[in-house]
Amino acid sequence: MTFKGPVQPGPMKVREEQETEVSDPEVVRRVFHELGMQAWFRYQKFREEYEAPGVVIALDETPVGTYVELEGSEEGILTVADALGRSPADFILDSYRGLFLAFAQANNVSARDMLFDTAADGTGA
């Protein structure tokens, strides 16, 4: 489970993150429910992770496209991006929800969530 704070202004998506493993997701769902919380967006992705000095490189396959996420120091990210033939002008700072909403609007998809079985066919989830 990950808490993600607000994005700081700048050419890269920088924000506080707190992460922990959840041994029983169903218990967490029940706790959230008892606290009055409801799921408002779900998404699926397949992730492969690689490492470069000081940078974690994640290759994310989602229902709306495949993306590379770089996590690490600014210098490390710029070095890896350059090695991949990319510059800060190529960086996507939007969230997966934002990417999904743009995809859904452009492709007349009515699904509420970014799931592999619903994004392509436009059905609701």
Where are these regions (language model features)?
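Polyanion/phosphate-binding surface patch
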Residues: M1-V22, D60-E61, T66-E74
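Short, conserved charged micro-motifs
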Residues: V27-R29, G76-V80
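Phosphate/anion-contacting hairpin/loop surfaces
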Residues: V28-T62, T66
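Residue-level "edge-of-site" marker
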Residues: K45, D94, D117
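Short secondary-structure boundary/hinge segments and terminal tails
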Residues: Y50-E51, L99-F100, G122
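Mixed-charge, glycine-accented linear interaction segment located at domain edges/termini
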Residues: L78-M114
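Cationic, histidine-enriched alpha-helical/coil surfaces that engage anionic ligands
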Residues: V109-A125
